[in-house]
Amino acid sequence: MQTGSGVYHAEELPAGTEMFQIWFEPHLARAVKEAPTYHQYDHEQFPVEEADGVRIKHVIGPQAPIRLVTDAEMADIEIAAGQSWTYSLPDGYALAAVVVSGRGTAWPQRQADGGAADNAPLETGDFTVVTTNGTESVVFQAEPGESLRLVAIRVPAEVEYPLYRK
């Protein structure tokens, strides 16, 4: 849903559906001039990659059917027990992740000096944000014997337009 100058709302959720809402702040002066839009997507419409015990469903971004007026990418990631997923975070961006289910760890791998920070434990319901001072990779590792599912969102750490007043 992109609200623009108003809102269209029409969810119909079948039994067993899980969802959460995320609001991205566009350039408000431009966004209010746009007509509101609403689209319903089915699971099969999202491209999925699978390799080395990691399944990535692209939700928002260049590989996904959902494109926004804001600079954002979003993926639903499932990491098999004991496996890891590494994401290269460009300079000037932040990666936010919410753990949907499971347990594991996350840590940044700094590419500039080759060092690594301590592992941060993660479990269902946890939310973490990683920002960079240069290109860096973030590693998410599932616990042995338990898979880890998270939703990861990449956005600019700062934008060059005014945000909503808090």
Describe each region flagged by the PLM:
Residues 1-166:
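Jelly-roll (double-stranded beta-helix
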